[in-house]
Amino acid sequence: MELIEVILSKENLNRAYKKVVANKGAGGVDGVTVEELGNYIRENREKIIMSLRNRTYMPKPVRRVFIPKDNGKKRPLGIPTALDRTIQQAISQPISDIYEKIFSDYSYGFRPGRSCHDAIRQALEYLNEGYEWVVDIDIEQFFDKVNHDKLIQILREQVNDSTILNLIRKYLKAGVMENGLEKATIMGVPQGGPLSVVCSNVYLDKQDKELEYRGLRFTRYADDVLIFTKSEMAANRVMKSISNWLERKLFLKVNATKTKVVRPTRSKYLGFTFLKNGGEWKVKPTTEKKKKLKKKVSEYLKRGRAVARPLAATIKRKRSIK
């Protein structure tokens, strides 16, 4: 069965719809809410499927919103329409199944059964094996700078269906609506839709494979990657070589100011810092991470969810965040 037929199968579409409804989320540029999506699909199902199959379907632009980051800056998100989120989810499910078989064991972001805590554990394993120099690669505006042609070229290696590749390219080129004005998207994968997660992992899997080919120890969560070596000289050599490779092969710009070679105690990764205690490397949350945890617990208590918990357990939970 061709991949387009797998994607358009009743089972896959229903699973995608349920996932979008469960995630809730805001509406896109067409104003259709997730709550209204079911009726819209029932009324237009055959027309939507036909347009996807014959390549006439045109995704709508994403709606630009900004969310605050821990450092005080704002992260741009692109919110697809509820229908486009469903279609993106339907595409992502079988493509994820294809790539899960070949993704690196050292890639942890947005993959089933994996988390940032697994990435941290892997980092600790390297450190406790004696790889105590860290190469912190910072890719400048990764999600905004993904090269569309290169991404499609990479996808074509595993996705042998021109209809799906054509549809993915349409989503990449769908544009962004900001302050009532539509802007073209000539590069990048807007964060906010299911496809951006899959496409970003597919793109950076090429980096993972290069690091594995070179026999390097690394851990990656989305675009956050750390490489571990046993000497400062090796770390500096790796930093220069991998930075050049990323720019030459994946057309990504490495932030020269933020990319650095450091000792583990000077490194921050996924909200944690490393420290050596009794000859063993461990982690502790950064100050920013602690603030977020305290805020979450305070909100949790305000919502009254602690009522069902023993009072002592609730107090202990809040006091444990020092």
Residue ranges and their predicted role:
Residues 47, 51-66, 70, 105-266:
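Conserved polymerase palm-domain catalytic core
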Residues 1-42, 46:
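Non-catalytic, polymerase-adjacent accessory regions of viral genome-replication enzymes
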Residues 173, 249-321:
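A conserved non-catalytic segment of reverse transcriptases
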